[in-house]
Amino acid sequence: MCAQKLSFDYAQTLHTVRIVHNAHSVHRSRVQKGKSCDCINFVRATDPACGTGGFLLAAYEHMKRQSKDIEKQKFLKNHALFGADNTALVVTLASMNLYLHDIGVNKSPIAYQDSLIDTSDKMYKVILANPPFGIRHQGSVEVAANRPEFVKTSDNQVNFLQHIMSIVKTGGRVGVVLPDSVLTDTGATAQVREKLLKDFNLHTILRKTWRIL
């Protein structure tokens, strides 16, 4: 049962990455009047709340199929992927997960850090994330102190959305899993949503329906 669950989760994650890629490709081809576009191919990608590295591994599998060029494959394995998580055990599991797929053999691409209080100036061309939802009871003060540009809120999902908006490069692409509340809540969430719609090109919203078994 456990193996089946892991297999299902990985398949869903890979499917999500493909959906993100296809959505961006369709949008870009429309903008460029039908020209093809490789949107997640051999660029630096990150997951700021990577968990055990499912999105990163799925992104790797997707990019690996795009070219057999040795130098591109080497770049992909050693320089293309970055992840972070604030739980030490999870970081170890993510590093091991990628290592078993020959990724980051010399140096793990997974950092043990809280992305919401990280003040580094690293920017990324592609961001894939399924951040934790809910209220951040601990650490809200640190977020406010380290990220004064953020709209102040204790909602994890809204803070991660703000973080993602701050680290995506101009012309970059983002695929992020968020709860419906990000689309409907008022207050701080509405302020962040307004900034998203004003300063970024939001072109695809997919809503997953859940079956109750």
Where would I find each of the regions flagged by the language model?
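N-terminal functional modules and adjacent low-complexity/disordered segments of proteins
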Residues: M1-A3, D9, K35-C37, E71, ...
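Non-catalytic, mostly N-terminal accessory regions of nucleic-acid modification and defense proteins
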Residues: M1-Y10, H15-V20, H24-N41, N106-S115, ...
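Conserved S-adenosyl-L-methionine
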Residues: R30, G34-A129, G134-R136, S154, ...
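Aromatic-residue hotspot detector
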Residues: F55, L116, E149-F150, R211-L213
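Long, N-terminal intrinsically disordered regulatory "head" regions
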Residues: M63, V141-V143
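Short beta-alpha connecting loops at secondary-structure transitions
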Residues: H79-F82, K122, A144-E149, T209
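Conserved catalytic motifs of ABC-family nucleotide-binding domains
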Residues: F133, V143-S154
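Conserved Class I SAM-dependent methyltransferase catalytic core
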Residues: T153-I212
